[in-house]
Amino acid sequence: MARIGDGGDLLKCSFCGKSQKQVKKLIAGPGVYICDECIDLCNEIIEEELAETSEVRWEELPKPREIYEFLESYVVGQEAAKKALSVAVYNHYKRVQAGENGGAQGREDAIELAKSNILLLGPTGSGKTLLAQTLARMLNVPFAIADATALTEAGYVGEDVENILLKLIQAADYDVKKAETGIIYIDEIDKVARKSENPSITRDVSGEGVQQALLKILEGTTASVPPQGGRKHPHQEFIQIDTTNVLFIVGGAFAGLEKIIEGRAGAKGIGFGAQIRSKREIESKDQFEQVMPEDLVKFGMIPEFIGRLPVITSVHNLDREALLQILVEPRNALVKQYERLFELDGVELDFERGALEAIADQAILRQTGARGLRAIMEEVLQGVMYEVPSRKDVARVVITADVVLSNVNPTLIPRDSRGRGPGEQKTA
């Protein structure tokens, strides 16, 4: 029996005016009522608005030249890699845009655009991770980094490949719609190469098994992701995420691959008439610029995995000049960062040219590339960063080559008797 209001009429929804008999449920509030149909409509409106705010604004998708110029302001050198990434990323999100617009306005003969994941080859400290991070920052999409060495095949001790997707969902604040257009960078992929070129009869759970497990999410599938990660909570509800529009950038150092490339290209030279190239001549070029898919298969990557990474590009070792540029030129250059740290204490920090050259030389000796520059800077500045904040008499710190090479103390320039530094102007 329907409830009757104070006026003798059936209760009605305050929003659509339908009576209690016309709807499944009527929820009462202080002086108002809302039906289940209006609640569903409100939910749809909210979901649409959230989807609009979470999606990339595709009409503003930057062109390849604009992407390249943005990368140029953060990453020194690696021109070929920056161009290849700019084109690949533009084409990927153009493909996503075409899919959201209904595939060429719903034409029956619409061409389905294939996914173009990226394989990025190059030595450690050459900028692979920074390139991927910078792309995600420019496009304002969620970004996650995963280490392939921590992954194992499902059912074994280690991380499942689905945990990579969980990191992306977390980066998107659990907005699955937004995560589905994000970028995932998988590092150290060369460490999951199988032990030999021939398929193994024994189970390789951290090598070939990981490559097999990655195939589906690279290609595009609806994956079930445990919200708490791992297998410790078997009864948890899974998050469904479609990886069709997730861009995967896969990177690795691939040490030893250059020998496989040289062997295929006949770099060693056999016979009287063969052209023999010197080691210096080979090293002067990008060691990975001639890579072919069969070289990667011989290295230990399975053909199906390489087939899902159609864009292959490389970064090269950074020379002394490139390391010097990295120290001072990019928007977030290391020297600028440390100058800002000292500025917050009211102290100027000056690096002489010789000091910067010595830091670059140390990074080359350690074979750590750009990643090693910060560690060297920390070693050089640790003592003065400990001392200077407690002293009010220091106006400027000068770092010379001897500070870097011989571990001598930096030059501390004091303020004058009125507390001014050497570069400060007198006030009237």
Curated annotation (Swiss-Prot):
| Chain positions recorded as Zn(2+) binding sites | 13, 16, 35, 38
Q: Which UniProt keywords apply?
A: ATP-binding, Chaperone, Metal-binding, Nucleotide-binding, Zinc
Q: Which ranges carry the ClpX-type ZB domain?
A: 1-54
Entry-linked InterPro entries:
AAA+_ATPase, ATP-dep_Clp_protease_ClpX, ATPase_AAA_core, Clp_ATPase_C, Clp_protease_ATP-bd_su_ClpX, ClpX_bact, P-loop_NTPase, Znf_CppX_C4
Name the GO terms of the biological process aspect. Answer: cell division; proteolysis involved in protein catabolic process
| Membrane-crossing segments per the record | none
For this record, an example GO cellular component is:
HslUV protease complex
Signal peptide (from-to): none
Example of a GO MF term: zinc ion binding
Binding-site positions, ATP: 123-130
Q: Which Pfam families match?
A: AAA_2, ClpB_D2-small, zf-C4_ClpX
Subunit text: Component of the ClpX-ClpP complex. Forms a hexameric ring that, in the presence of ATP, binds to fourteen ClpP subunits assembled into a disk-like structure with a central cavity, resembling the structure of eukaryotic proteasomes.
- Record's function text: ATP-dependent specificity component of the Clp protease. It directs the protease to specific substrates. Can perform chaperone functions in the absence of ClpP.
**Which family does this protein fall into?**
Belongs to the ClpX chaperone family.
Protein's UniProt name? ATP-dependent Clp protease ATP-binding subunit ClpX
Gene encoding the protein: clpX
